[in-house]
Amino acid sequence: MRIGFHTDAFNSAYFSFEKCLQWAQRNGVRYIECGLIDGVSWAHGLGYYPHVALFEDPVLLRRKMENYGVCFSQVDAAYPLSGKDGPIRGVPYVIRAIQWSALVGCPRVDTTDGLHAPAGLSDQQALDLMKYSYEQILEVAEAHKITVNIEPHGYFTTKPDYMARMLDFSQSPYLRMNMDTGNTYIAGQDPVAFLKRFVGRTSHVHVKDVSESLAAATRGQQTGIAVSHCALGEGVNAENIKACLRG
């Protein structure tokens, strides 16, 4: 097991990505995950956003990260692929993320669906659309030997039967799952049972606890947690996390 962190943890602290690298070096954390920006953002440009833009040269960034003793475990390219704009916005974004990842030395790219059922599409239509999208994505992923993970975070992916269908879009070894203990819990699922069903397809895990107040207010009504403000072990999901880690 290798422990890292997602730079989302520093969204509210307004860290830059380099400040996250400094934190990782100081605390002896070698692995890091961040989001990818496909374009420019004032917050990122001013150093108030702890993620990376695709215009940043991946080889130069890899060298900078090596100087800090840090490398990527995964990058987050989770534009929802379940809506009508999934093929036209999400697919090109994920493909660029894969190509960039190959140069920066990152082995995995995270993807997901939307939080809600997509407007104007039946569930079957949305699944068909996502299958077509993932087929295009995986062609590029296989060429670059980059794993594409599907994260439980939305309407489809937090339902185990739909996740199973999505993981069966392809038999490629480069299509896997990114487990998330917080998202599955807040969606009303049992994280332990969820992971047990897909443990053979899991290549990366987001470990998130859930506060008692958030669980009481929204469990079974949301499909994901944007940022967890509950430290591990301090919430109602702690025992589930322990069980997941024990396997």
Predicted feature locations:
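Glycine-rich, proline-tolerant flexible connector loops at the mouths of alpha/beta enzymes
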Residues: 33-62, 113-121
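The substrate-binding groove and active-site-proximal loops of carbohydrate-active enzymes
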Residues: 9, 47-52, 78-88, 230-235
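Acidic/histidine-rich catalytic cores of soluble enzymes
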Residues: 2-5, 17, 32, 125, ...
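Active-site acidic/histidine proton-transfer and metal-coordination neighborhood
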Residues: 19-25, 58-74, 80-177, 197
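Active-site-proximal loop/turn and secondary-structure-junction residues that shape catalytic pockets
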Residues: 9-11, 36-38, 78-81, 113-117, ...
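Mobile, glycine- and charge-enriched loop segments
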Residues: 1-10, 14, 71
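A short, Lys/Arg-enriched amphipathic alpha-helix followed by its capping loop at the start of a domain
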Residues: 3, 23-29
